């Protein structure tokens, strides 16, 4: 399966049987190279990936400044140290799951809930970890 198929079929999927889906998603290498993304995923800046990777290595690094992605600032909320970063902006937010080689991004807006975004992103991330990726 291509990386784009993972994005299209597993991240941009129908979450609840009602046609709800993430606003944007991507699979990005630890070096910031985009492996695959939805058409709506923002253009990443190198310093944003550097900050995200540093927060995985040093949990709490992004808390004072916020998580920036494509120039959008998210307030960092509870995650899982070294594994998951979560952010909030208005009625939407972001979940980032770190695997051995990649970062799985999911961005949501209402009516999709934070829990639904977490489930979609972490399910694919956990699968990739199991596959050694």
Swiss-Prot record:
Which InterPro entries does the entry link to?
Answer: PFN, PFN_euk, PFN_sf, Profilin_CS
Which CDD domains does the record match to this protein?
PROF
Disulfide bond as a keyword of this entry, yes or no, is yes
The record's listing under Pfam families reads: Profilin
Highest taxon of source: Eukaryota
* PROSITE patterns assigned to the protein according to its UniProt record, in alphabetical order: PROFILIN
MF annotations from Gene Ontology: actin monomer binding
- Compartments (UniProt record): Cytoplasm, Cytoskeleton
One Gene Ontology cellular component annotation held by this UniProt entry = cell cortex
Keyword annotations for this protein, in alphabetical order, are: Actin-binding, Allergen, Cytoplasm, Cytoskeleton, Disulfide bond, Phosphoprotein
UniProt keyword rRNA-binding present? no
Q: Which cysteines in this chain are paired by disulphide bridges?
A: 13-117
Motif: Involved in PIP2 interaction; annotated at: 83-99
Output the PTM entry.
Phosphorylated by MAP kinases.
Phosphothreonine modification sites are 113
Which family, according to the similarity comment? Belongs to the profilin family.
Quaternary structure and partners:
Occurs in many kinds of cells as a complex with monomeric actin in a 1:1 ratio.
Function, as annotated, reads:
Binds to actin and affects the structure of the cytoskeleton. At high concentrations, profilin prevents the polymerization of actin, whereas it enhances it at low concentrations.
Q: What more is known?
A: The variability of the residues taking part of IgE-binding epitopes might be responsible of the difference in cross-reactivity among olive pollen cultivars, and between distantly related pollen species, leading to a variable range of allergy reactions among atopic patients.
Put simply, this protein is called Profilin-3
